[in-house]
Amino acid sequence: MSFRIATRKSKLALVQTDYVIDLLALKFKMQCEKVLIRTEGDRKLDVSLDKIGGKGVFVKDIEKALIEKRAQAAVHSMKDMPNELLDLFEIIAMPVREDVRDVFISPEGIKFLDLPKGAVIGTSSIRRAVQIKNLRHDIEIVPIRGNIETRVRKMKEEKLDGIVLAAAGVKRLGMSEIITEYFNPFEFIPAVGQGAIGVEILKNSEYASTLGKIDNEDIRMGVEAERSFLKKLQGDCHTPVGAYSVIEGEILNITGIFQVGNKLIKKDVCGDKWDYIALGESLGEKIISG
């Protein structure tokens, strides 16, 4: 019997799952099959995420497949994962992290700072909206949901001046040519876990030892530092919060943003990468204290 991996049905989710499947085939000669799940977040594209339960809407139906033994593992975008998992589950591996940056896509190829006054940009991310406004107070923000292809289509149909997306998704779909420009990740802070793929299993799974061998330690430490920062702030998809971690040698640097009232606070900390959880918490405390 083949090893079953639960995943969303979107083209991007399938590309990410195929990456894990290829890795398992290469390292362990495992035969895998995909179990396709249409999540609540995929079904309710006309409703904002904060109204249907936040990030968990992309995860709960997939985790149900693990509980019901329809799949032995699941592949997720780490930025979609709730800050705290149920005790039943664990992220056993984070094998890869693509480009963490956000990108601006303009149908006319106009760069962000060159847009006309009052230009209209589509995003349903509060984090992106706040940072767009921080850079250009005159920009009008309109909500836009759906997969990458859908959002690009809506941008053209609704005659928007542009949209902001995650570079990782655009690149994984082989659509880099539509990118007008990349935002500097130190100036336009990405979402927690952006670009990282996570493999989730039930705790005490018989496959834990094998799947753990595809984990990338530095990627995990960086993402977990960002997640501990988010947890300290009790942030979620309703909150303008972002974090960006970089590991150089044994040093981890993490930069975070959080909006308090109308003020966008940005801080950073650095230290020994093995203290990644404490570093994330320290950054949260630093931002809370102003």
UniProtKB/Swiss-Prot annotation:
Q: Which UniProt keywords apply?
A: Porphyrin biosynthesis, Transferase
Q: How is the cofactor bound?
A: Binds 1 dipyrromethane group covalently.
* Keyword Transmembrane in annotation: no
S-(dipyrrolylmethanemethyl)cysteine: which positions carry it?
A: C237
Question: Which Pfam families has this protein been placed in?
Answer: Porphobil_deam, Porphobil_deamC
Q: Does the keyword Transferase apply?
A: yes
Which is one Gene Ontology cellular component term of this protein?
A: cytoplasm
Q: Quick one: a GO biological-process term for this protein?
A: protoporphyrinogen IX biosynthetic process
- Report the EC number(s), separated by commas if there are several: 2.5.1.61
Its pathway is: Porphyrin-containing compound metabolism; protoporphyrin-IX biosynthesis; coproporphyrinogen-III from 5-aminolevulinate: step 2/4
Catalytic activity reported: 4 porphobilinogen + H2O = hydroxymethylbilane + 4 NH4(+)
Question: Which Gene Ontology molecular-function terms are recorded?
Answer: hydroxymethylbilane synthase activity
Q: Which cofactor does it need?
A: dipyrromethane
Q: What class of enzyme is it?
A: transferase
Family to which this protein belongs? Belongs to the HMBS family.
Q: What else is known?
A: The porphobilinogen subunits are added to the dipyrromethane group.
On assembly, the entry states: Monomer.
Describe the function of this protein: Tetrapolymerization of the monopyrrole PBG into the hydroxymethylbilane pre-uroporphyrinogen in several discrete steps.
Task: Give the protein name, as stated in the record.
Answer: Porphobilinogen deaminase
Question: Which organism does this record belong to?
Answer: Clostridium kluyveri (strain NBRC 12016)
